[in-house]
């Protein structure tokens, strides 16, 4: 054995070409993927949150709040109609 493994100093990592080659691709790719996820509306579908134009309907102009925790399912069904 050559000895104990030692962590590489962070300054060495930041100044390496390999780090910047990898991260110059992955960081913008993550940013673009997140922007597309939100701008296409897929985030609303995945997490089930209403779109901004679905919070208020013509019939219901007050905030859709669940106030009774024991009948919450019935309230949610009534609010989603």
Swiss-Prot record:
The chain crosses the membrane at residues 21-35. It is a single-pass membrane protein. It is found in: Plastid, Chloroplast thylakoid membrane. One of its GO terms (molecular function) is iron ion binding. GO terms for biological process: photosynthetic electron transport chain. Its cofactor is heme b. Keywords: Chloroplast, Electron transport, Heme, Iron, Membrane, Metal-binding, Photosynthesis, Photosystem II, Plastid, Thylakoid, Transmembrane, Transmembrane helix, Transport. With its partner (PsbF) binds heme. PSII binds additional chlorophylls, carotenoids and specific lipids. The keyword Iron applies. Pfam families: Cytochrom_B559, Cytochrom_B559a. It comes from the Eukaryota. PROSITE patterns: CYTOCHROME_B559 (PS00537). One of its GO terms (cellular component) is photosystem II reaction center. Heme binds at residue 23. Belongs to the PsbE/PsbF family. Heterodimer of an alpha subunit and a beta subunit. PSII is composed of 1 copy each of membrane proteins PsbA, PsbB, PsbC, PsbD, PsbE, PsbF, PsbH, PsbI, PsbJ, PsbK, PsbL, PsbM, PsbT, PsbX, PsbY, PsbZ, Psb30/Ycf12, at least 3 peripheral proteins of the oxygen-evolving complex and a large number of cofactors. It forms dimeric complexes. This b-type cytochrome is tightly associated with the reaction center of photosystem II (PSII). PSII is a light-driven water:plastoquinone oxidoreductase that uses light energy to abstract electrons from H(2)O, generating O(2) and a proton gradient subsequently used for ATP formation. It consists of a core antenna complex that captures photons, and an electron transfer chain that converts photonic excitation into a charge separation. HAMAP family: PSII_PsbE. This is Cytochrome b559 subunit alpha. It comes from Tetradesmus obliquus (Green alga). The lineage of its organism: Eukaryota, Viridiplantae, Chlorophyta, core chlorophytes, Chlorophyceae.
């Amino acid at each position: 054995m050559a000895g104990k493994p030692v962590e590489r100093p962070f300054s060495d990592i930041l100044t390496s070409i390999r780090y910047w080659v990898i991260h110059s691709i992955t960081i913008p790719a993550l940013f673009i993927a997140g922007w597309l996820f939100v701008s296409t509306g897929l985030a609303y579908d995945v997490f089930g949150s209403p779109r901004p134009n679905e919070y208020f309907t013509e019939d219901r102009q007050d905030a859709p709040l669940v106030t009774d925790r024991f009948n919450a399912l019935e309230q949610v069904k009534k609010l989603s109609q």
